[in-house]
Amino acid sequence: MVSVCRLLLVAALLLCLQAQLSFSQHWSHGWYPGGKREIDSYSSPEISGEIKLCEAGECSYLRPLRTNILKSILIDTLARKFQKRK
């Protein structure tokens, strides 16, 4: 009985320790909490033309158009309903 209690105590301590370590964040150079990076620190001469266009606010390839998202959701919903009918 004593060994079972010790085993449960050790398991509980390890679980608490694992939970504490899993929520810790690794801080890399130039990164801030939440995954935000300092914009001024990333200045490389190898910046592509696409990134330069994004700085001007014209990066549509990074954000899908809302109409395409709604269209794909509707198509997926209709396809699921059609499969349920079969």
From Swiss-Prot:
The modification Pyrrolidone carboxylic acid is found at Q25. Its main location: secreted. The keyword Secreted applies. The keyword Hydrolase does not apply. One of its GO terms (cellular component) is extracellular space. Keywords: Amidation, Cleavage on pair of basic residues, Hormone, Pyrrolidone carboxylic acid, Secreted, Signal. It is found in: Secreted. Residues 1-24 form the signal peptide. The modification Glycine amide is found at G34. Transmembrane segments: none annotated. It holds the Pfam family GnRH. InterPro entries: GnRH, Gonadoliberin. One of its GO terms (molecular function) is gonadotropin-releasing hormone receptor binding. Stimulates the secretion of gonadotropins. PANTHER family: GONADOLIBERIN (PTHR10522), PROGONADOLIBERIN (PTHR10522:SF8). Belongs to the GnRH family. This is Progonadoliberin-2.
